[in-house]
């Protein structure tokens, strides 16, 4: 009963059913988990395999997303199972999902989507509860995602790394922490709370000096440390993201011989388990690992394992699991074996453990597959180097042959081949080391029947001839080797040392021409004696001829002539014909189907067929987008290739070459890469230029496997590079499929990433389909083929022939060494070995002759010595060659000259080497480390090891300082100019704000000027009465009030000075802004840039250098002092020694030596001079006598050894020559002794100070001694005793004085030494802090350089806005100046017009009876000639309409329009007065024309200023936006800078952060604050208090002034009220009512008011009648418009109906037109005419509508001008 059925489409369901999946992917890391005590789970291809550990039975859980299964994880409760899958890319793909299954029910509980783009590579549940699931994606995103899987929600996500991640695990001890590891990295994660929320923060482990390694396994220890594996076999202990210690075995051996693939912590047993590629599981003491500390001289620690269990010798272990009780392990190796290790209850684990192999499965990528023609047996070649015989129905491994090298090529041998013993299954395999092997299946397994190393590199392809008699092997080194396959091993080649190759008989090899590429596949030509056709990775087919049978290969297998005989054929395929897209839906879909495949292929990837498809929208949108893309690609391809359908050569690799059985000379070819050639299988005829398409391939990946089955090859089996398998029925044998035929069956059986199909085959009875791929899986499917496609019954029923040992040829010696010679190298080496053997034999014979001659000569010498002295021959007569001595002396001289030259060369070499070392180690140093000892005690102080500041650093520092100074100067200059400009702008702005606009303050000031001028003129002329003067005075007062009120600011006005003061106070408040505040924005002057940071770093580096250099100067000065002190002390000690001698002489019987020792004892420990470590440079250059003596001894020893060797080499012939040389060696001794004595003598100079005294004591003569004894016997007199006592006291005084002086000198030096040491300690701390600050600065500099580009863009934007603003401000200022000038001029003009009016009042007083008529004449507007500055002709007249439009006087006087009548002097009026009024009118009109012109100019300037102000507001808004972006950017930059960790050393008294009176364990929330800043803030508080007190006093004074002003205001208001009351009382008393003075003025000044009222009434009646007439006309036109609108609507409806009818008629005509004659030209012409008529009708109606609308608008206007 099949476990599952794969139905690829509903049409073809039931064709194939999956029965089993053989293989185990043990090469994938972390791919084995325990579900329960008896079940393990592993992923392979698209299945999750459930393996029973007790029976070896397998169950399968199929994948759901079609791309394979990527990872698996088990819930801590073992009731749930998480499976992360892979999804094939495409528009319909929703991406891979993580499915949560229940166990053991295997039902889907939850589905997690959106965690990665293509595939999952690792999964893990957290802790004991398992509430959180961690998933890691594969290429291209590598996303680490944390899931709340119960809610199917993503909690956090981050990119794990940029390379493959092998595993992920939560910390079992610390919540919120997890670890990932993979290719070249390990990363430690924690869920951290930041100011933007919860985030995943990952710290990458830094390998430092340890070699970078892939981390396949890791385990976390309880204290947070992590133990990880390496590729080299060591264990790394991580602590805080750094390697704490590297663990090795004793002897610096790695923990395992090979990579460590699994780690396990057995906490109850207190041990750590590790499994490696050496087949062993080693146990390590947990305590020793956890507490491991590195040695002082190394970063490693040697540990001995507690025990080890040998699982399997030579097995590369890949997984290690332990059951819940910890008493059984489950182990897997890379060969596909699964073991259980039962641990003993007590005693040593290594001895008591029982290892049981549970199951053996094929593992590793499958390189080839061969199915038996008789039984259900297959030969499977795995890439791990193992060839297996497999019963694919039961899954049992029948036999296997393993080699240490990978299998890179595979081909089966036909049963008729001579190399198949007894017709048994035989296959040829090629390996990575260039070896070709033949294996035949026999009764005992797989027998090796042939082996030969043909190539230096890997074997790329193998091909066997149709008759099975020849084999060709192509290697990656560009060589092609031909073998003959024989039934029996061939005899040797006759060359000794050549190995036997079994059934492989080497024939010859050729080298391919350069540029041919690497061979990927091959096939033999069908013709008898034909050569080989080889496909390459460059898309070419090479025709290689067969070497001739008579080729001489005695000296070499190479056939040099064959290289030039190789011919090449380029695979050229026709370009696909892309059909043009039609608008119809069905046609569009077909076009998408046909052309879309090509487009998808162009975007695909070679490996795995992966595609980077974007997320599409709806189906229709996707189709439209693809159609547009296809059209664009078609156009581009047509332009590039000259049109679709042209030839196209492929540059991808050729994957397979097969002879077409039904057509001699034709090849079936499949190609890789991308493009059209990889989409199909092709039929290639070598004589034709183009290949013909044979079968449609796959849209996502190239065809990698092509086979035929069924009767006459009518069934094609295809496999793709991304794991798809297809069965295709063919229309003809070995031909193509029927047009439009769909696949018989197709399924994604293998992994989409690593599942390149490498083998397909039907069983001999057609009941099964077997597939193999690079993912290591072998799928067995039951087939239910149609009868016409089922293969015929087998003609060879029965069991597989298995020959016994007797029927097999002798096993040839296998080639296992990686450095073994190839066949060609073996042949060449064999000849060289033969020549070496002959030379050695010849040398041995010569040595034997020499030995006989030497023995004969020694016998003659002995006989001569035994003869009587008289009969003895002199030794000279026994010299064999008398000229030998002269030859030897000449040879000695020659060798001496050679030695001299060699010595000179060696001396120069040593000098250059020393100079190079000096240049490398010392030239860059300004001062090296020097130690200075104190004179008393063991205190030492050292210098700073200071490197010179490089010239580049100094130049960069100088340039940056110069740039900083230039920038500061430019900024100061810009600030000065900006301040002046700002003040000017503020002043102008203030004037503009308080002055109002032209219609406000300007008009008020103009009225004030007019009123003032009129009043002054009237007063001066004396012609006005008092009423007129009072009226003019009131107008002036009103104008003054208006002007005053115009200058009053509104309630929203803010003084610029106040705003500037507030901003200055806010800026200089003196508070301390915390940079950790998320809203903190760094001030402009404090913002860091890469240049500022680099300058600060350089200045800090220079300061550190200067500090160290200054200290070193003090140090060397103190060293000079020590040298001088020691010199002075030596002098004083010599004086003390003389005093000791004098004291001994004074005391008489005292021992002088004892006295000197007593005197010098306090200073016995003083050095005689500076020590070598105190003068390293001088000591390095100095060569002492001891060094010379040691060198002489070494040289003598070398000469002795050389002489001994020379004497031994010459044998007995050197006896006479060696004798006279012996005394010379002995004669060298006196010279050496003299040198030593000289050295000793020179060494005694230091103690020469005491020499004279001792010499005096030892140099007494006998008489002096007798005299001394005699004097000693004579008793001393009192004088002598007194003199002796005086001498003793004098000596003691001098001794104490000298001792005190020496002690004072020593103490002074030691005090200076102590002070210098204390200073060094402080400076060293400062220097280290500065160096740490440099490191922090470097990190900040890197961040600043990352942000610099964005900041530059923002600064450029802001500067552009500032420039625009400044330009606008300048324009506004210029415009304001112009306005002010125009206003002043306007006021003058208004005053001049007022003077004209006042002159009129003087000419025509109020009492004049003709005043009203003359005033009307004065104010009348007349047509005047336009005055032009240049004179000349032209149109001088203009209409008074322009005056009416351009002027608006706004006066209260009557403004009569010219009625067109003739103007005459009023009857009875004086003609001179009339003419004078006309002249004044002309003056008034001139002034009003100028006023109108100035008013127009002022209005233009005002509008221009308003436009500029509006533009300024827009620019300021843009500047504010840029400043906001800059502030956000600065916040982001400061946030990143805040993340840089800074080390601050604090003492306990500096920590003032207590919780409940105790220091908390976590200080992450505390704030580190500078004491200087704290003091500054405290001082600033005092300053602010003082400022507040001053401001309060100023405020109090202002309030007092304000109160005084209020009192003055109240007094003035009371005075005004008093005056108003008095005026009211006076008016009531005189007139009985309050007089309205303005009304009185108007009444008194307008005598014709009643007349004007009558005229006004008449005009109103006339205008009312005219208005009524126009309203009637408008109503009539409106009715007409409604009628026309309805008619137009009816026409439009008719047009719409006619258009619909036309379309229906066209559809009917189109449907019934097939077969009828129709003239398309006439139809087209009729359609055009009808459409033109409709367009003309619509245009006419639109024109009529526009005309009616225009009439309506004209009728609606009430201000229609008579001049219009």
From Swiss-Prot:
Intracellular or extracellular location(s): Cell projection, Cilium, Flagellum; Cytoplasm, Cytoskeleton, Flagellum axoneme
Gene Ontology cellular component annotations, sorted alphabetically: axoneme; motile cilium; nuclear speck
Source organism of the structure: Chlamydomonas reinhardtii
Name of encoding gene: CFAP44
Purpose of the protein: Flagellar protein involved in sperm flagellum axoneme organization and function.
Gene3D superfamilies from the UniProt entry: YVTN repeat-like/Quinoprotein amine dehydrogenase
PANTHER family, per the entry: CILIA- AND FLAGELLA-ASSOCIATED PROTEIN 43-RELATED (PTHR14885), CILIA- AND FLAGELLA-ASSOCIATED PROTEIN 44 (PTHR14885:SF3)
Name of the molecule in the record: Cilia- and flagella-associated protein 44
Xref: SMART domains: WD40 (SM00320)
Biased composition (Basic and acidic residues): 585-596, 604-628
Biased composition (Basic residues): 575-584
